[in-house]
């Protein structure tokens, strides 16, 4: 399955290229730069006539932040945002993703390899309250201690 996916985004490369590429990935940043940025560029080239953004100069690369977005496209929007950050020399964010989008173990590995935080859904009200508190503490700690920025979609 993965070889077919890679072939789509790296059509000029041999299957050995994919094996070597995967072996060369040592960090999440490596994965995001070597694989995900290529994927996002491919999506933009094949689905958009034009892509522009503004306001990036309002982000201080030396500080961590919380990026809030609407719930329009929970996968593609943050992926594009990561590419914009990367292209502007700003560290990429962690991304909160609902567990309803994690359909199998392979998807979970891919999501976690892309600096994503699993948000548990479909639980009791009490469990949701406790889970939300834990997520809030995690976000606050990461930002206030300058560990990482967070991207979060809201409804």
Residue ranges and their predicted role:
Residues 63-69, 135-155:
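Conserved Motif II region of HX4D acyltransferases
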Residues 69-70, 78-79, 96-99, 122, ...:
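Glycine-rich, histidine-containing beta strand-loop boundary motifs that form or position
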Residues 94-130:
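Conserved nucleotide-cofactor-binding alpha/beta core module
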Residues 80, 131-138:
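Well-ordered alpha-helical segments embedded in enzymatic catalytic cores
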Residues 46-49, 128-133:
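A conditional alpha-helix N-cap/helix-loop micro-motif detector
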Residues 84-95:
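A short alpha->loop->secondary-structure connector
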Residues 1-65, 71-82, 86, 108, ...:
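Membrane-anchoring hydrophobic helices of lipid-metabolizing enzymes
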């Amino acid at each position: 399955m993965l070889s077919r996916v890679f072939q789509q985004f790296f059509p000029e490369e041999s299957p050995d290229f994919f094996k070597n590429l995967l072996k060369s990935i040592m960090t999440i940043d490596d994965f995001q730069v070597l694989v995900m940025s290529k994927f996002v560029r491919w999506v933009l080239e094949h689905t958009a006539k034009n892509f522009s953004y503004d306001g990036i100069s309002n982000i201080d690369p030396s500080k961590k932040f919380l990026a809030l977005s609407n719930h329009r496209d929970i996968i593609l929007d943050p992926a594009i945002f990561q590419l914009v950050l990367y292209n502007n020399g700003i560290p990429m964010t962690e991304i909160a993703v609902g567990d309803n989008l994690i359909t199998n173990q392979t998807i979970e590995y891919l999501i976690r390899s892309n600096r994503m935080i699993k948000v548990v859904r479909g639980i009791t009200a009490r469990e949701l309250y406790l889970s939300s508190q834990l997520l809030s503490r995690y976000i606050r700690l990461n930002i206030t201690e300058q560990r990482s920025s967070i991207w979060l979609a809201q409804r």
